[in-house]
Amino acid sequence: MENTTYIYTDGSYLVDDKRCGYCFLYFQHGLENQLTFVFGKCNAVASTESELIAIIKALEYFKNLSGQKENTKYVIGIDELNIFKFITKKVYREFEINGWNYSDGKPRKKNTKLWRRLVDLYKMFPEGTLKLKKVQSKKDKYNRQTDRVARFILNKELEPYVLR
């Protein structure tokens, strides 16, 4: 799979502080030993929010890369099943049709802005160039690495950073 970039994301959340750490790593096909980590922290109100932020940061990063090639494919490994299904099963279409309310008309209460941002970014990638892959939390080696960095960043006074 030449011209494929593999991305793994994870978020970590501290209930007491209402903060999250996020991390994503990436590497090019065939260059698994050349990992790049991108991480940061921000305020959050729930664990799912930290996972959403990690994926959004990754998508924003690759959408904004200068000189991005049209024929590049992206595979994103995520461990959050709800987010995986929301995109791959196209659950978001129902929310778009219903004005981001549930089918019974009740408003979606949590993280609506983040869910919408995720969908907007997902749609910015040409069809067939972005694939989500469900990975097992803390069992996939790249997920373990992003989890460790996301948890580590919560306890440090570091700014968002790219580490190669």
What are these regions (language model features)?
Residues 14-16, 56-147:
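RNase H catalytic domain
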Residues 51, 55:
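Short, conserved alpha-helix that lines the donor NDP-sugar binding/gating region
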Residues 1-49, 60-63, 148-164:
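RNase H-like nuclease fold core
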